[in-house]
Amino acid sequence: MSDPMDTSIADQSFDWKKAVWTLKTSPKTKLFVWKALHGAIPAGEALRARQINVDGKCKRCNLPETIDHLFFHCPFAKQVWTSAPVFPSIEYNGSIVLRNQWINLISRKNLPPTGVEGQLAPWILWGIWTARNNLVFNDKLTSAAETLSKAIYLAREWGTCQTISSPLPAVPPTLA
């Protein structure tokens, strides 16, 4: 496994605030993205590199489960990303490395009628991760369409909750 600090993410010019901490997404999703960008997600090959005796292969396609494979190179992940309602669309021209493509992914515009105000990429990563965990731990296969729909739903729901105005001030009842 390569050292996450050997990539452009370690560059002093990388804007962590813009790339992670100011994303319009839930705090747990921000932390998840931060961990993914640092190579700290417990995917199969990462666990094996830590001497944990697990099968390091992807449960969907049986290839080595690296973070980049899990989120981009697995046929399941490719299907999720290519179906994502963003502009410009995600194209696969060679190898995609999460740490090198993150700013590009969060810069994409959501197409209507998603109703998502912020970036969709963090929610898609989270959706792929939870679909993977459902397969690994619950033996439940989730389709790419279901994964993408859930990511859009969660992004929209979280955004709606953030824009709900504060409740009206309480007015004591009048005494007659």
Model-derived features: where do they sit?
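Primary recognition of RNase H-like, Mg2+-dependent phosphodiesterase/nuclease domains
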Residues: 1-176
